[in-house]
């Protein structure tokens, strides 16, 4: 079985509504999309990860010309530095809410915590027996939860590197995870087709949702933790009531391609969903309508993360199987920049909560994390 990679990919105009700092349209949008693959894609990274310990992490000063801006748009991200240390594919990269740290997970079975001030690896968290597919931060930036092919999740305390809980219950690869905003619950999705909700204090599963008919690729809480979005290879995005575990909405488009990633917008009114037909869609989930679709990248095999950037320009950001990171104008759907520098598909990406910084991570044999900065 493969191990660690996750995702995203992306309709039209008339901006009117404010989403926190994001303005999005309320008119549905059309757009053609490539046919969905005939079979469910493979999990996500190299199989049978070895236990080879990662070498000491380093920060390297890269060629500033590695990032290329498009002729249109105003994004001007440039490669700031490269972080090395993981020995296998990078599956996810997440900035801490405080912005001081970057957490990365890998098929090498480890989670690394990088200090963003000094661009060094401060801690390597170990304990999983197989590759790690995803991580998430608690709201106070004190803990991370990790999801692994070993069918478990683990909660680590960052200051001490201590593993405080192991969450057991899934009977197949655990592919995705997230804390609720209160950091009292963890939600997880698995290849066993279920979504589970866990009590952080006790480490016990308090709800098991028979969520989908294929592997669950992504889970996301909304801004107050009252709702959970889940995406699956069955082509559905489902919205769940956290308190009672009931499905309150199912989003599906006409062609029903596998869903590789889902994420609530900052104000919780919209959902960004990536499909394995090389599209990213922005949904008004209350109306069950697609508002915008973003295309131009390649995404037919892996689960690739996608992001809202709100610190400078209002962008949608995603990795791609052509080894690049794509940046779209949220409103116009135009590709405003394409970042080049990785040598393998880019599954992991995240946007810094305060600064105009993007982190990206690639599959092996690249295994590198690039840090990009913009002054716009």
Swiss-Prot record:
CDD domains, per database record: WD40 (cd00200)
Tissue occurrence: Enriched in the germline. Detected in all nuclei of the embryo. In larvae, expression is detected in the nuclei of seam cells, somatic gonad precursor cells Z1 and Z4, vulval precursor cells, distal tip cells, hypodermal cells, intestinal and muscle cells. Also detected in the neurons from the ventral nerve cord, head and tail region. Expressed in the head and tail region, intestinal cells, muscle cells, cells of the vulva, spermatheca and sheath cells in adults.
SMART domains: WD40
Subcellular location: Nucleus
Site (Important for interaction with histone H3): 149, 175, 305, 364
GO annotation terms (biological process): chromatin organization; determination of adult lifespan; programmed cell death; regulatory ncRNA-mediated gene silencing; transdifferentiation
Recorded superkingdom: Eukaryota
InterPro entries for this protein: G-protein_beta_WD-40_rep, WD40/YVTN_repeat-like_dom_sf, WD40_repeat_CS, WD40_repeat_dom_sf, WD40_rpt
Name of protein: WD repeat-containing protein wdr-5.1
Organism: Caenorhabditis elegans
């Amino acid at each position: 079985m493969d191990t660690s990679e996750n995702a995203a990919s992306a309709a039209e105009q008339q901006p009117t509504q404010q989403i926190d700092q994001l303005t999005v349209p309320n008119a549905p949008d059309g757009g053609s999309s490539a046919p969905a693959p005939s079979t469910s894609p493979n999990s996500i990274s190299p199989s049978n990860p070895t236990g080879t310990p990662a070498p000491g992490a380093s920060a390297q000063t890269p060629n500033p010309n590695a990032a290329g801006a498009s002729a249109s748009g105003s994004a001007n991200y440039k490669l700031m530095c490269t972080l090395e240390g993981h020995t296998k594919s990078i599956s996810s990269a997440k900035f801490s809410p405080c912005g001081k740290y970057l957490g990365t997970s890998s098929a090498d079975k480890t989670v690394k915590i990088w200090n963003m001030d000094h661009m060094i690896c401060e801690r390597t968290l170990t304990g999983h027996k197989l590759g790690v597919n995803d991580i998430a931060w608690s709201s106070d930036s004190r803990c991370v939860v990790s999801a692994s092919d070993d069918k478990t999740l683990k909660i680590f305390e960052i200051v001490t590197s201590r593993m405080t809980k192991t969450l057991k219950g899934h009977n197949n690869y655990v592919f995705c995870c997230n804390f609720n905003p209160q950091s009292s619950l963890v939600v997880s999705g698995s290849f066993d087709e279920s979504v589970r909700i866990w009590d952080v204090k006790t480490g016990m599963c308090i709800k098991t949702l028979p969520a989908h008919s294929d592997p669950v690729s992504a889970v996301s809480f909304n801004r107050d933790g009252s709702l959970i979005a889940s995406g699956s290879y069955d082509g559905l995005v489902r919205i769940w009531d956290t308190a009672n575990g009931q499905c309150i909405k199912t989003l599906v488009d006409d062609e029903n391609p596998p869903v590789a990633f889902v994420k609530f917008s900052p104000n919780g009114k919209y959902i960004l969903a990536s499909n394995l037909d090389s599209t990213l869609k922005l949904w008004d989930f209350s109306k069950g309508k697609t508002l915008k679709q973003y295309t131009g990248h390649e995404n037919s095999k892996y689960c690739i993360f996608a992001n809202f950037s709100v610190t400078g320009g209002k962008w949608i950001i995603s990795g791609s199987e052509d080894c690049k990171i794509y940046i779209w104008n949220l409103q116009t759907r135009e590709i405003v920049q394409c970042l080049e520098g990785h040598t393998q598909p880019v599954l992991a990406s995240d946007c810094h909560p305060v600064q105009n910084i993007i982190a990206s991570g690639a599959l092996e044999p690249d295994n590198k994390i690039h840090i990009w900065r913009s002054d716009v």
